[in-house]
C-alpha cells in the first residue's frame, strides 16, 4: 500500500548539539515516504554548514533571524504545500520519537481525516512521565490545562479528543492548512501558536486528537530547577517580574484570553484581557508578600542578611 507523504518540519536556532540525536531518531522510523525540512533561522554556531556536510539528504531552508518558531515552521509548511505533500509534521529538534511514529499517526489520520493529531509527549529524562497529553481550555477565562500532564505512563487504548494538541509533534493534513491557514506568526511568534491554530482549525470543522499508542520524548529541563515551580518564593517572584520569558508569557496569555472570547462569543471585548491582568497583579502581589515573609523567617532562623539572597 502506498504511504502518504509527510514533510517533517523542524525549526532550529543555535543548537548544533541536538542535530545528530534528533536526525538519528527520525531516520530510524519505520516509514519511507517522508522528507525532513529543517529551517535554520539565523544560527551562528555552524548548524547549516554542519547539516550540509553531514546530512545532505535533509531539505535546508534559511530564515532571516527574525522568524522565531512560528515563522520558521510556516516557511517549512510553505515548502511542503508547494511540493504537494499530504501531511506536515511539526517537530522540535530537542526530542526523539518511537520508530512507529509516522505509521501510527498517518494510520489514524486515515481513520480520522478531519483531525489534527499528536502522540503522547514524555520527558526524556523520565521516560514514563507525561509532559503533554493534550490541552484543555476555559473559553471564558482563557486559562489552559494539560491532559494527563505529570502523570506516569497513562495508557489509553484509543485516540481521544482535546481542545488543542501540542506543537512538539503535530501531524496536520494539508486540507487543514488550505482551509484554516498556517500558524499566526503576527500574534503568536513563539508560544501558544499551536493552541490558536487548533482553535482556528476547529472553527473550520476539524478536530484535535491525541494518539496514545505512539510517543515522543522531549529534552525539556527538569522542573526541579524551574523557577516557576521553585519552593523558594523569592526566586519565583524575581522570575515573575523580571524574566523576559515571563513577560512574553504575560503578553501572549493576554492575547489568548482576548482571542478566545472573540472566537466563542463572536465579538471583541476587553473583559477577558482585563480579568487576566487582574489575576497577574494579584499573583505578583501574593508572591511579593510570600517573599518578604519567607526572607524574614530565614533571616531570623539563620541569623544573616538575606536582602540579596535568591
Could you describe each region identified by the protein language model?
Residues 85-96:
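Short beta-strand-to-loop acidic/aromatic patch adjacent to the donor-nucleotide binding site
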Residues 230-310:
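Non-catalytic, C-terminal membrane-associated alpha-helical segments of glycosyltransferases
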Residues 164, 169-172, 176-181, 187-214:
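A short, conserved alpha-helix in the catalytic core of glycosyltransferases
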Residues 24-33:
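Short, acidic, metal-binding catalytic loop of nucleotide-sugar glycosyltransferases
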Residues 40-49:
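A conserved acidic beta->alpha catalytic loop
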Amino acid at each position: 500500500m502506498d504511504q502518504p507523504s509527510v514533510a517533517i518540519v523542524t525549526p532550529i536556532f543555535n543548537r548544533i548539539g541536538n542535530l545528530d540525536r534528533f536526525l538519528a531518531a527520525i531516520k530510524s522510523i519505520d516509514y519511507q515516504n517522508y522528507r525532513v525540512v529543517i529551517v535554520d533561522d539565523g544560527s551562528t554556531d555552524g548548524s547549516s554548514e554542519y547539516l550540509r556536510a553531514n546530512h545532505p539528504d535533509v531539505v535546508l531552508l534559511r530564515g532571516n533571524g527574525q522568524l522565531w518558531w512560528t515563522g520558521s515552521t510556516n516557511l517549512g509548511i510553505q515548502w511542503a504545500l508547494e511540493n504537494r505533500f499530504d501531511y506536515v509534521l511539526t517537530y522540535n529538534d530537542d526530542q526523539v520519537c518511537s520508530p512507529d511514529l509516522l505509521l501510527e499517526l498517518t494510520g489514524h489520520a486515515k481513520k480520522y481525516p478531519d483531525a489534527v493529531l499528536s502522540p503522547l509527549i514524555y520527558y526524556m529524562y523520565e521516560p514514563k512521565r507525561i509532559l503533554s497529553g493534550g490541552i484543555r481550555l476555559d473559553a471564558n477565562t482563557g486559562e489552559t490545562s494539560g491532559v494527563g500532564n505529570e502523570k506516569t505512563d497513562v495508557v489509553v487504548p484509543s485516540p481521544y479528543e482535546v481542545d488543542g494538541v501540542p506543537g512538539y509533534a503535530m501531524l496536520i493534513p494539508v486540507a487543514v492548512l488550505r482551509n484554516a491557514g498556517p500558524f499566526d506568526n503576527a500574534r503568536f511568534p513563539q508560544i501558544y501558536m499551536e493552541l490558536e491554530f487548533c482553535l482556528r482549525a476547529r472553527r473550520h470543522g476539524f478536530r484535535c486528537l491525541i494518539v496514545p499508542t505512539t510517543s515522543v520524548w522531549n529534552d525539556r529541563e527538569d522542573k526541579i530547577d524551574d523557577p516557576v515551580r521553585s519552593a523558594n518564593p523569592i526566586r519565583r517572584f524575581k522570575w515573575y517580574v523580571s524574566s523576559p520569558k515571563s513577560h512574553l508569557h504575560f503578553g501572549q496569555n493576554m492575547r489568548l484570553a482576548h482571542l478566545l472570547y472573540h472566537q466563542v462569543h463572536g465579538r471583541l471585548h476587553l473583559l477577558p484581557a482585563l480579568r487576566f491582568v487582574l489575576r497577574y497583579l494579584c499573583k505578583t502581589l501574593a508572591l511579593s508578600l510570600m517573599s518578604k515573609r519567607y526572607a524574614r523567617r530565614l533571616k531570623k532562623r539563620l541569623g544573616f542578611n538575606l536582602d540579596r539572597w535568591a
